[in-house]
Swiss-Prot record:
GO terms for cellular component: cytoplasm. The lineage of its organism: Bacteria, Pseudomonadati, Pseudomonadota, Gammaproteobacteria, Enterobacterales. Homohexamer; trimer of dimers. The gene is garL. Keywords: Lyase, Magnesium, Metal-binding. This is 5-keto-4-deoxy-D-glucarate aldolase. The record marks 89 as: Increases basicity of active site His. Pathway: Carbohydrate acid metabolism; galactarate degradation; D-glycerate from galactarate: step 2/3. It is an enzyme of class 4 (lyase). Substrate binds at residues 151, 178-179.
């Protein structure tokens, strides 16, 4: 092989508990995604849950990252095998699964990414991920090079964090701070002490099971605190947030 698909460097870095600094991509544009890739982030989330992304918009973004060292991570809209299969076939190896609340849901996400007998992924002999049949060892290598990160963002997920983190095939735990805050009765206030304490608890339980933990933290002070608490993969901003802040600052400079 000469295409450097394997090994999955992001999966290797997570397993080694290496700090990985990332960014969120929500504008669904190959141009902005390419710019993010050139910035030097270790990983990028291409959001399919809250951003207007689907297969047709994600393929150009994967192409835009072809020459980048940033690992593309897709957040699927839901933990559904057919959706996950389509993302696998277009070339994603790293998955962020939203709203996982039980060990069974975590195991289902893992199974959706594995070919039988280890999982339930459907087989296509020619697709973008295996360079349309030109990667000879794709089937032998694929199962062990998929990264599964599950999001904990509800009270039930918090209650089951140990079982979720212990699930075979789960590579990392990701905290969804906004939804977690809402579930705890603090909508719009992820900085509430109770929410922060719960985030720290999730990190600790993930670490106890040898699993790296991550979070989205667009405020620098928050990101640095989470890193101090043991988070190893942190998204420190988003293309949408940076674009909005930058354009607002530019307008204010001349309009006020």
């Amino acid at each position: 092989m000469n295409n450097a698909i394997f090994p999955n460097k992001f999966k290797v870095a997570l397993a080694a508990q290496q700090v990985q600094i990332g960014c969120w991509s929500a504008l669904a544009s190959p141009i902005t995604t390419e710019v993010l890739g050139l910035a030097g982030f270790d990983w990028l989330v291409l959001d399919g849950e809250h951003a207007p992304n689907d297969v047709t918009t994600l393929i150009p973004q994967l192409m835009a990252l072809k020459g980048s060292a940033s690992a593309p991570v897709v957040r699927v809209p839901t933990n559904e095998p057919v959706i996950i299969k389509r993302m696998l076939d277009i070339g994603f190896y790293n998955f962020l699964i939203p709203f996982v609340e039980t060990q069974e849901e975590a195991a289902r996400a893992v199974a959706s990414t594995r070919y039988p007998p280890e999982g339930i992924r459907g087989v296509s002999v020619s697709h973008r991920a295996n360079m349309f049949g030109t990667v000879p060892d794709y089937f032998a290598q694929s199962n062990k090079n998929i990264t599964i990160i599950v999001q904990i963002e509800s009270q039930l997920g918090v209650d089951n964090v140990d079982a979720i983190a212990a699930t075979e095939g789960v590579d990392g735990i990701f905290v969804g701070p906004s939804d977690l805050a809402a579930a705890m009765g603090h909508l719009g206030n992820a900085s509430h002490p109770d929410v922060q304490q719960t985030i720290q608890h999730i990190f600790a339980r993930a670490k106890a099971h040898g699993k790296p933990c991550g979070i989205l933290a667009p405020v620098e002070a928050d990101a640095r605190r989470y890193l101090e608490w043991g988070a190893t993969f942190v998204a420190v901003g988003s293309d949408l947030g940076v674009f909005r802040a930058g354009t607002q600052k530019l307008a204010d400079t001349f309009k006020k």
